[in-house]
Amino acid sequence: RGIFRPDRSHAKSARSVAETMGNYHPHGDASIYDTLVRMAQPWSLRYPLVDGQGNFGSPGNDPPAAMRYCVTGDALVRLPFGQSVRLRDVVAGARSSSDNAIDLKVLNRHGDPVVADKLFHSGEHETYTVRTAEGYEVTGTANHPLLCLVDVGGVPTLLWKLTEEIRPGDHVVLQRTPPTEFGPADWQDAFEALHLGAFISEGFVSENRAGFNNLDREFFNAVLTAYDTIVGGPRYVSSRTIASDSLLHELDVHNLTALKKSRLGELVGQRSADKAVPEWLWKAPAVVKRVFLQALFEGDGSCSALPRNTIQVSYSTRSGRLAKDIQQMLLEFGVISRRYVHATGEHKVVLTSRAQAELFAAQIGFGGIKQAKLQGLLDALPQAAAGRDGDYVPGLAQFVRKHSGSRWVDKDWLNRHNIDRLSRWQRDGAEILGRIADPDVRAIAQELTDGRFYYARVASVTDSGVQPVYSLRVDTDDHSFITNGFVSHNTEARLTPLAMEMLREIDEETVDFIPNYDGRVQEPTVLPSRFPNLLANGSGGIAVGMATNIPPHN
């Protein structure tokens, strides 16, 4: 209560809700925040117990603002149809500490489109970066909540955790629902994406000259057609036999006048280590991004068979920024990858499971002859996948086995089989559910294994310094939106002097304390309550079929 005293500055509503949920009410934050809002509304309580700062609704049933939390402006907010936008670019030139009305459709935690109606530029604050073992990152303030998978008394539960509460070894939720696509790509955007991907991988654009080469004649011709259509101007084409006895096809451009006027002009003079996905491409729909990734992987990507009947798809680059961008764009298609720095200094993005290789082949693929090689490797695998991969629900197997309520024969089957891997649920989900007797256990298992989420282990939470931070107000019950694949949540408050009277002398052995739900902290059985809240503000309830109401008193 010391943080929320009336003689101190207002604290973020997020912090109040998170501490209540973490210590006393592990059943979601909506009811906690609704209660906080009601206690701040003078038309709801005769004597409000919370001093709210911000939009806490109105007597005319205008809804309160969502709890405000903040991430850095470079975070990519996911939009419908596979589009995305940097948070700082939602409102160009937004002033520090400003509220900006918007009308933007974003995706919520389930991958469904919802409306964001406000962008908050919250000024500059201390920030922290959450990084997963795979290399996914998001940076935000200490009070920014991310959706996590938490063990609550042995039950794997989706709960919000503040960045300051997240520790290495925790599991954060990444949204990986493939985008909804609507119609074919605009031909100009598709051509621009094709030759952008090709030139980033196997081309160069210096101040005075540009070029591209590739061994695949059909892919080379596709890039050449795109170049002539989008850029135009003089260029030279040739072929030569290289040391491996392969025929290399080359495009050479000496006059860059036309090229500099096109979107390829962004690459002029760019070093290999500085390559990145341009902002216009992030805002493009999935059908355009797919063309870019196909060309990119056909250039510097590869696929190969690994032991234990699995396949690796990888991309190598000298640019750490490009590797990070590629990993993020793959995630937008639902493909999970790992990012790391090789001993040679190259940054690698790799898919090391059969399931992800199959998803890559189906959702994206290579842009040329390498796709046939990948499909051949996949076709050669046995029909049923063997072994274990990293795509699983932590704690699910133990929970199901302990609480299934099943017959002995079904319990024995559940104990002997791997039931926490997503690949197993996709293949044998009906059989697993048929062996779980308890309907609540079945419901929990189905929600966690429907494929929407990837449960990524946190590798580190590090200080990222003071940065400008932003947030969105989303017009839904849980106020969720997607930032860099992480599920983000989105008023400030403090107690009133009357509320402090309800807590006065609580630390002086005036009431009894008992362990909370998980035994980590103590909670009071009652409040000292020198202020008679039930009489002053009134109350109501139902017990044994009889309604009881106490009207408010002066």
Curated annotation (Swiss-Prot):
Among the entry's GO cellular component annotations, what is one?
DNA topoisomerase type II (double strand cut, ATP-hydrolyzing) complex
Subcellular localization is given as:
Cytoplasm
Keyword ATP-binding listed? The answer is yes
Q: Which residues form the active site?
A: 69 (o-(5'-phospho-dna)-tyrosine intermediate)
Which positions fall inside the Topo IIA-type catalytic domain? 1-554
Q: Pinpoint the DOD-type homing endonuclease domain residues.
A: 195-335
* UniProt GO molecular function: ATP binding; DNA binding; DNA negative supercoiling activity; endonuclease activity
Q: What is the recorded post-translational modification?
A: This protein undergoes a protein self splicing that involves a post-translational excision of the intervening region (intein) followed by peptide ligation.
Catalyzed reactions: ATP-dependent breakage, passage and rejoining of double-stranded DNA
Q: Which UniProt keywords apply?
A: ATP-binding, Autocatalytic cleavage, Cytoplasm, DNA-binding, Endonuclease, Hydrolase, Intron homing, Isomerase, Nuclease, Nucleotide-binding, Protein splicing, Topoisomerase
Listed InterPro entries = Hint_dom_C, Hint_dom_N, Hint_dom_sf, Homing_endonucl, INTEIN, Intein_C, Intein_endonuc_central, Intein_N
Quote the record's miscellaneous comment: Few gyrases are as efficient as E.coli at forming negative supercoils. Not all organisms have 2 type II topoisomerases; in organisms with a single type II topoisomerase this enzyme also has to decatenate newly replicated chromosomes.
NCBIfam families named in the record: intein_Cterm, intein_Nterm
Q: How does it assemble?
A: Heterotetramer, composed of two GyrA and two GyrB chains. In the heterotetramer, GyrA contains the active site tyrosine that forms a transient covalent intermediate with DNA, while GyrB binds cofactors and catalyzes ATP hydrolysis.
Q: What does this protein do?
A: A type II topoisomerase that negatively supercoils closed circular double-stranded (ds) DNA in an ATP-dependent manner to modulate DNA topology and maintain chromosomes in an underwound state. Negative supercoiling favors strand separation, and DNA replication, transcription, recombination and repair, all of which involve strand separation. Also able to catalyze the interconversion of other topological isomers of dsDNA rings, including catenanes and knotted rings. Type II topoisomerases break and join 2 DNA strands simultaneously in an ATP-dependent manner.
Assigned protein family: Belongs to the type II topoisomerase GyrA/ParC subunit family.
Q: What is this protein called?
A: DNA gyrase subunit A
